[in-house]
């Protein structure tokens, strides 16, 4: 899996592929939003945002099992225990298949109350129903496609992973355009097109693992439920980042509808799309380095995984500078991609909201990296604390406090407060681990 190339070369190879994969992966939802906004209307786009927590749940399940499985498999391979790696890989895919099919059934049974729970009402109600109806049949594909994308990188094929994700994204763009602008299928068509593109990526990944060039492959196995006591905590830290993103979108949607109305929801929808892209970029640096960190951790090579941590901070620092400057300078242009110039007041509000929200990007990447590193070296309690703190506890508390005390545009500062509090906690956990390993 991991050859003896220089550590920096391996880091750049894995991280570049993962960042590109996750950035492209983000385009699935962004393309939906953009084409729905242009082809149906901005309130239809806002309705799609109401359904985003559902896709966040699907991705979070995929991330939890992908990162946990990938981490343990990498450790097994570092210890030359290939049969255990094969068994865990096979068990993981079978279990997730059952989970995905169950979710599809539950969504269709409880479709209308689920849409109301997400915040659908008035002009957004039917749009949300239609979007969920088009997406739900492909719940399994959303979970499995991301899961296999991570595992293929652990198998030593990061280039195949990014090529497959790009293929799926291009298919999504084409199918979205056909569904919305040619067939006039509206938001249902956008959702169904996205699902079909996920199905395509699943098929490509399965061909790899059913072929003869992979390091680990499908085997007969006996279900080992005990492994999940180790696996889920390892993946939970990264998965909860995605899950908390969905929960916070849900909470923001509710608070914004109360404080700022439908136009505020449109502004936040744009922020949510930008935020997803930025979070996934930072997750790409974290997750791309995790198999390498776990491999060197499994070998007992402390110098190796500490050097990888330094590389990670350098990469995060560069990306943070580029992203922060881009958001601050080009906020009106970013908002204009979704809204156009025909509504200048709404465009100005969206740009101002994006700049206020974007202050959190100064610390976001470092917090995600520290949580991911602690996952890779089997420190799940610390990693989970960081992820839950930055993604939910601190941010939800700040949001509700600012909504009550300030209201209006003050709520956009909740994320930067959350990231600052999380940074203090993350640095403490990381320094404690490094001191312990140095002793």
Protein language model regions, located:
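Short alpha-helical transmembrane segments in multi-pass integral membrane proteins
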Residues: 1-18, 73-140, 182-236, 293-360, ...
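Residue-level signal for transmembrane alpha-helical positions in Major Facilitator Superfamily
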Residues: 12, 16, 28, 65, ...
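Transmembrane helical elements of multi-pass membrane transporters/channels
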Residues: 13-32, 134, 145, 168, ...
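Small-residue-rich hydrophobic transmembrane alpha-helices
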Residues: 45-105, 142-161, 267-331, 364-386
